């Protein structure tokens, strides 16, 4: 397994989407940038907000695409092409309906599970699914008919606090991820529940 060299947080651009559940992946990268005291800045060549940080002794590229979710792959592919990154050097943070708020999971490879941002990313990477994922639990509304409104809705105060607590725990596991200690990172994160 290759070392993670870039962390990408998926979401939708604009203030009307900033606080929606679908932007939970972007919240991870924004929190990491704040923790690193390095602001994300608009970078046209990567179609998003970008920063290079030094975190836990590693140089890491951070990106929040400013494309809409279903076009995230364009930004991911642009970053990979510019820095000669392979898909297995990426950690992509995204919202996950199948996990409760207050929890998060790492995953290696796999399908898109109906997530439009992942679907477009897989396509833009030539159908290479070998990237790592950081799945941020947002819970499920209970009915497939309610999913679109749910992911584009804002979590309540307690739900957002639980999601933020899970993101904080993600940041505490990132040094292990960057060191290649996936077992340690997974063991810690997967046992956390806010």
Curated annotation (Swiss-Prot):
- The highest taxon in the source lineage is Bacteria
> How would you classify this enzyme at the top EC level?
hydrolase
Q: Name one GO biological process term.
A: protein quality control for misfolded or incompletely synthesized proteins
- Site (Stabilizes the basic form of H active site to accept a proton) residue list: 95
Q: Detail which positions bind tRNA.
A: 17, 68, 70, 116
Q: Does the keyword section mention Transport? A: no
Q: Which SUPFAM superfamilies would you find in this protein's record?
A: Peptidyl-tRNA hydrolase-like
Task: Answer whether the UniProt record assigns the keyword Hydrolase to this protein.
Answer: yes
Q: Which reaction does it catalyse?
A: an N-acyl-L-alpha-aminoacyl-tRNA + H2O = an N-acyl-L-amino acid + a tRNA + H(+)
Q: What is its EC number?
A: 3.1.1.29
Single GO term (MF): tRNA binding
The active-site annotation reads 22 (proton acceptor)
Please give the Pfam families that the UniProt record associates with this protein: Pept_tRNA_hydro
Q: Where is this site: Discriminates between blocked and unblocked aminoacyl-tRNA?
A: 12
What positions belong to coiled-coil segments?
none
Where is it located? Answer: Cytoplasm
* Entry-linked InterPro entries: Pept_tRNA_hydro, Pept_tRNA_hydro_CS, Pept_tRNA_hydro_sf
Q: Name one GO cellular component term.
A: cytoplasm
Q: Which UniProt keywords apply?
A: Cytoplasm, Hydrolase, RNA-binding, tRNA-binding
Subunit structure of this entry?
Monomer.
Its function? Answer: Hydrolyzes ribosome-free peptidyl-tRNAs (with 1 or more amino acids incorporated), which drop off the ribosome during protein synthesis, or as a result of ribosome stalling. Catalyzes the release of premature peptidyl moieties from peptidyl-tRNA molecules trapped in stalled 50S ribosomal subunits, and thus maintains levels of free tRNAs and 50S ribosomes.
Q: Which family does it belong to?
A: Belongs to the PTH family.
Q: Name it.
A: Peptidyl-tRNA hydrolase
Q: Which organism is it from?
A: Chromohalobacter salexigens (strain ATCC BAA-138 / DSM 3043 / CIP 106854 / NCIMB 13768 / 1H11)
Write the lineage as a comma-separated list.
Bacteria, Pseudomonadati, Pseudomonadota, Gammaproteobacteria, Oceanospirillales
